[in-house]
Amino acid sequence: MNLMPRYRQVADNFAIEDRPSKVAAPQLLLWNDSLAKAFNINVVPELRASTFSGNEQQAIAAVALGYSGHQFGHFSPRLGDGRAHLLGAVEDAQNQLWDIQLKGSGATPYSRGGDGRCALGPAIREYIMSEAMQALGIKTTRCLAVVGSGETVYRNPPQPGAIVTRLASSHIRVGSFQYLATQGDVAGLKNLADLAIERHYPKIQATGPERYLAFLAAVIKNQVELVVSWMRVGFIHGVMNTDNTLVSGETIDYGPCAMMNSFDFDTVFSSIDKQGRYAFGNQPNIANWNCARLAESLIPLVNDDDEQAVALMTPIIDGFAEQFNVEFSAMWATKLGLAGTDTADKELIAELLQLLKEHQLDYTNTFDALTESLTGGMSIPEVLVQWAGKWQKRTDDRSYTVMRAANPRVIPRNHVIEKILSEYNKTGSSELLHEFMQVMHTPYENTDKLAKFQDAPSSDKEYYTFCGT
């Protein structure tokens, strides 16, 4: 495993050198063998637990990164990696660098009094969700390993501790730029923006202010595409703070996330999102808002005069809504296999969504049924039969293939994950987890054990998600 240092060149106080804290009895619980092979991570089995617990990393100059964040709209100027250590980066087969980070590896200078640890349940949840999202075709951070610490993490209630090994194409967040902007560190901002462009947007060849305007536009494009992909499968992030918004356009932080069952744009599962700020249907607005916060941070790189900088960036920010509407309409067209375009399509889609909400139909299973109905494989829900007569006139012989690629047959449902975690906690068995991950590996295909994980819960009104911190 060849680790390459990064981030230290950005600013003096951006990446603080720190080392993981040793744990009592590391035990490898989950290992992502295909991911390890993709990155040529050749750690022998007997050393994996000690390596990815942090116990073998004492000689490596790991770092904790600083960042700020708007958390539920309230600004915190100093957050940072309070329980994570960035070891460096590894190269994939395309020679692209990916950060490798330990999460739950002990307190850092950014811990703000926290213990720096992670409980086992949230660690397993991150493993399941990140790999499920990858299989669903959604840009995401990845999970290489989960290592039990052999120690108790004092949450409510006390739980076994664990360390997650996370891979990401970078950990550069909107909050990373806010952190340097708050300090007035223009040189650091430029270094960070140039690093982000180098890693994620190398096609940007412009110089001067145009370079950073192009960067902002590229981030917006990726955020639009990311949120549309979330909504295609019913994913609700739950904590879309600016510190959880990567400029790469990858999904990060699966703590309070959930999947929508019955369709409703107002769906919220997070226990702390009392106002529905991060509801399913509000995710585009929040992504737009977060991009505006990035733009504010980039002002010194665009023009010395704030008003002129804002004038240059405002049209780019305002373009988010139009881009989203185009991509969102295209998403519904693929989910319904609509042939060509028709002025009545908007009304057709709106009618379907109203029926889904009114009859509390399951989002995933309804679109699966519509897809399979084109080949006679499944019947359409009775309440949709009249609507389906109009829809079928808009399909053609290519519709099934288009719909099958857009509509998963299985998703990481909330109650399924809870069942997996419950079984693991009670018996220590990962059999159900591996069985589910095998099915989830091909979520758009019909596999042997698919039906076991397809059923929607009778109700999830009392289901709440929590941050694992």
UniProtKB/Swiss-Prot annotation:
InterPro entries assigned: SelO
Keywords recorded for this protein, A-Z: ATP-binding, Magnesium, Manganese, Metal-binding, Nucleotide-binding, Nucleotidyltransferase, Transferase
Cystine crosslinks: none
Catalytic activity: L-seryl-[protein] + ATP = 3-O-(5'-adenylyl)-L-seryl-[protein] + diphosphate; L-threonyl-[protein] + ATP = 3-O-(5'-adenylyl)-L-threonyl-[protein] + diphosphate; L-tyrosyl-[protein] + ATP = O-(5'-adenylyl)-L-tyrosyl-[protein] + diphosphate; L-histidyl-[protein] + UTP = N(tele)-(5'-uridylyl)-L-histidyl-[protein] + diphosphate
GO MF annotation: an example: AMPylase activity
Binding-site residues for ATP, renumbered to this chain: 80, 82-83, 103, 115-116, 166, 173, 253
Domain of life: Bacteria
UniProt EC number: 2.7.7.-, 2.7.7.108
Entry binding sites for Mg(2+): 244, 253
UniProt-annotated catalytic positions: 243 (proton acceptor)
Co-factor requirement: Mg(2+); Mn(2+)
Enzyme class: transferase
Chain's role: Nucleotidyltransferase involved in the post-translational modification of proteins. It can catalyze the addition of adenosine monophosphate (AMP) or uridine monophosphate (UMP) to a protein, resulting in modifications known as AMPylation and UMPylation.
Similarity section: Belongs to the SELO family.
Protein known as: Protein nucleotidyltransferase YdiU
Originating organism: Pseudoalteromonas translucida (strain TAC 125)
